[in-house]
């Protein structure tokens, strides 16, 4: 109770909010045209609520857009957009579309097909569901209009799409939204673009082509207007402080080669073909002969370790390595990793509990005030309520 009270009373001066990955399809798909608003749902697109995207409220899976059916009766607002992930659609989101059709709501569902359950590790959705199949499913729900928007529309030229389905390039997304918001009834945009994290994994594994082209911003030409960030909403476009003021640069390690930042009205971009990232020079092996072997404490009860850091920097990798080390050493580890969104730049924590084989533990979560060690890879996250709640002056 004392630990819980300390955690609740603690007010951190700043919080880390996660952001979409570089090249995330939601960078484009969650935009709304001027004068319109959107509603969120379950998925990484949930993060649009704390971005400048006029996206408000969210529901449980299968409830996307349902509140608008009631709200629309008491407002002069004529239309709303609703974001709906493909995994959620397969789970129960189709029921939300069905109720909207039955209610005669003026609403546009944006079904975001990213080919993976990105927020829990990039697994495929629990069943077969292609963009072509979605067009047929919503067509038979009797929606007013269906538009398939893709970064590679040419792959669907001869596809079996539902009758009346329009095929548009993602560069036309704003035009498509302006058209559909004026169509009475329920309309659907099937937005097809592979999850950025999954695209990066596939390129590393050699199962997806890696474009031989990179973009570089010439700081001598850049005026720091930020239009590249406005157009792309990409986390790989970073501020660059110079003697002439703040400019922009592209973090080449983060960039996933989407090139949407090129849409910015700017002459400072340089396109490089055949260029590769310069590798760090190999360092000599560290001399660890003078480092004494650590004294491993005898575990009489569960030993609890909390890791706190920034998403995308390897916090979950470290927790997995420590858990495997405990397993190799004959101990019984349990790990609870923070999941639910692609936490790029956001706060991430992992609970690692280690016990003896003859004294197993029942739950992976560290109880309030029970952490033996906190590895704070980032001071902001280590100072968060969630982390302070685990600490105790007598034990941590």
Region roles according to the model:
Residues 1-119, 124-132, 175, 280, 287-390:
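Thiamine diphosphate
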Residues 253-327:
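Long, charge-rich boundary regions
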Residues 116-207:
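Glycine-rich ThDP/TPP pyrophosphate-binding loop and its adjacent helix/strand module
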Residues 52-56, 116-127, 131, 157-165, ...:
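Short beta-alpha connecting loops at secondary-structure transitions
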Residues 391-396:
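ADP-ribose/adenylate-binding Rossmann-like module
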Residues 16-29, 34, 215-243, 303-306:
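C-terminal accessory/binding modules appended to enzymatic or scaffolding proteins
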Residues 193-194, 198-205, 223-280:
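Iron-sulfur cluster-binding cysteine motifs and their immediate structural context
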């Amino acid at each position: 109770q004392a630990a819980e009270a300390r955690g609740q009373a603690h007010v951190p001066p700043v919080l880390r909010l996660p952001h979409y990955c570089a090249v995330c399809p939601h960078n484009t798909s969650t935009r709304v045209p001027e004068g319109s608003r959107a509603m969120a749902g379950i998925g990484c697109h949930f993060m649009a609520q704390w971005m400048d995207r006029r996206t408000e409220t969210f529901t449980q899976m299968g409830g996307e857009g349902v509140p608008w059916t009631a709200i629309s009766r008491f407002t002069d607002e004529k239309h709303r957009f609703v974001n709906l992930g493909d995994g959620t659609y397969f789970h129960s989101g189709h029921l939300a579309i069905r109720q909207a059709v039955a209610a005669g709501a003026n609403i546009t569902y944006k079904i975001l097909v990213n080919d993976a359950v990105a927020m829990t590790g990039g697994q495929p959705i629990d069943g077969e569901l292609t963009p072509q199949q979605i067009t047929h499913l919503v067509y038979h729900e009797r929606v007013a209009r269906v538009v398939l928007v893709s970064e590679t529309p040419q792959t669907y030229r001869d596809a079996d799409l539902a009758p009346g389905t329009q095929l548009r390039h993602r560069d036309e997304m704003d035009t498509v939204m302006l058209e559909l918001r004026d169509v009475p009834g329920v309309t659907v945009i099937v937005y097809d673009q592979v999850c950025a994290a999954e695209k990066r994994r596939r390129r590393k594994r050699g199962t997806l082509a890696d474009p031989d082209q990179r973009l570089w911003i010439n700081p001598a030409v850049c005026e720091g207007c930020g239009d590249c960030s406005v157009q792309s909403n990409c986390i790989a476009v970073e501020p660059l402080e110079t003697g002439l003021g703040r400019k922009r640069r592209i973090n080449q390690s983060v960039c996933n080669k989407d090139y949407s930042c090129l849409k910015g009205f700017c002459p400072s971009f340089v396109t490089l073909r055949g260029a590769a990232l310069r590798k760090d020079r190999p360092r000599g092996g560290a001399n660890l002969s003078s480092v004494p072997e650590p004294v491993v404490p005898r575990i009489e009860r569960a030993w609890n370790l909390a890791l706190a850091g920034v998403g995308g920097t390897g916090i979950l990798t470290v927790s997995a390595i420590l858990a495997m080390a405990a397993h190799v050493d004959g101990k019984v580890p349990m790990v609870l990793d923070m999941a639910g969104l692609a936490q790029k730049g956001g706060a991430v924590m992992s609970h690692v509990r280690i016990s003896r084989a003859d004294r197993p533990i029942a739950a992976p979560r560290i109880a309030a005030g029970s952490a033996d060690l906190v590895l704070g890879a980032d001071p902001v996250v280590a100072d968060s309520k969630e982390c302070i709640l685990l600490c105790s002056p007598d034990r941590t």
